[in-house]
Amino acid sequence: DRDSCVDKSKCGKYGYYQECQDCCKNAGHNGGTCVYYKCKCNP
């Protein structure tokens, strides 16, 4: 599911989203970005 990483990945205030990226990649997505402190996976 596209937002499966939202609760599992930290999104810091200053663009720290490696954890989000890794989670999304592991879930089979093309990375991810942080939007309002929440991790959103790319399609």
Curated annotation (Swiss-Prot):
Expressed by the venom gland. Keywords: Disulfide bond, Ion channel impairing toxin, Knottin, Neurotoxin, Potassium channel impairing toxin, Secreted, Toxin, Voltage-gated potassium channel impairing toxin. It is found in: Secreted. SUPFAM superfamilies: Scorpion toxin-like (SSF57095). The keyword Disulfide bond applies. InterPro entries: Ergtoxin, Scorpion_toxin-like_sf. This is Potassium channel toxin gamma-KTx 4.2. The presence of a 'disulfide through disulfide knot' structurally defines this protein as a knottin. It comes from Centruroides noxius (Mexican scorpion). The keyword Secreted applies. Disulfide bonds join 5-23, 11-34, 20-39, 24-41. Its main location: secreted. Belongs to the ergtoxin family. Gamma-KTx 4 subfamily. Gene3D superfamilies: Knottin, scorpion toxin-like (3.30.30.10). One of its GO terms (molecular function) is toxin activity. Reversibly blocks Kv11/ERG potassium channels. PROSITE patterns: ERGTX (PS60026). GO terms for cellular component: extracellular region.
